[in-house]
Amino acid sequence: MKLYTKISSGKFKGKRLELPSLSTTRSTKSIVKESFFNVIRDEIYSLTFIEGFGGSGVMASEAISNGAREAIAIEKDRAAFKITQSNLASLQSPNLKAINGDSFALLPDLINSQNGKVLLYLDPPFDIRAGFDDIYEKLVNLISQLKKEKIYMIVFEHNSDFKFGDEISAYK
């Protein structure tokens, strides 16, 4: 049985997107997605939105629907990536793309090579995939590799019991 979600606002509001298997991804809850874009909508127009752990690409799709200059979803899991590609292609937006690969390896060069500012959205598959036990330490290391002047904002979805240190205090 396939699972679906819908784009909640913007140009593509109501467009149905497929969700990958719950065994490899954890989709952002609709209430979180809607609340996030209600807050950020007026700021997103000049930004490149990068979804570091794309899953279905729903956040990148929502970003382009709400007027982001460009949106990119990165997904490592091959099966999830195929769904991401299909979802993004269904929107027929030239400013929306999917990349299959490791976010930790790809993000520093991708962000540091951008012409404009980036809104980086990170919702890693903590507690789901093998090898993600030290996910937050990896994220802190990733952030240390980014040029501050390229970042407009970094958004993390994380377990509520984890507290980031001063490493991210320089970012909005």
Predicted regions and their residues:
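Short, glycine/acidic-enriched loop or turn micro-motifs at the edges of active sites
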Residues: 54, 78, 105, 126, ...
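Accessory RNA-recognition modules of RNA-modification enzymes
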Residues: 2-9, 19, 98, 119-123, ...
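Conserved SAM-binding motif I beta-strand of class I
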Residues: 70-75
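S-adenosyl-L-methionine
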Residues: 1-66, 77, 82-115
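S-adenosylmethionine
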Residues: 114-172
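Short acidic/polar active-site loop segments enriched in Thr and Asp
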Residues: 69, 94, 152
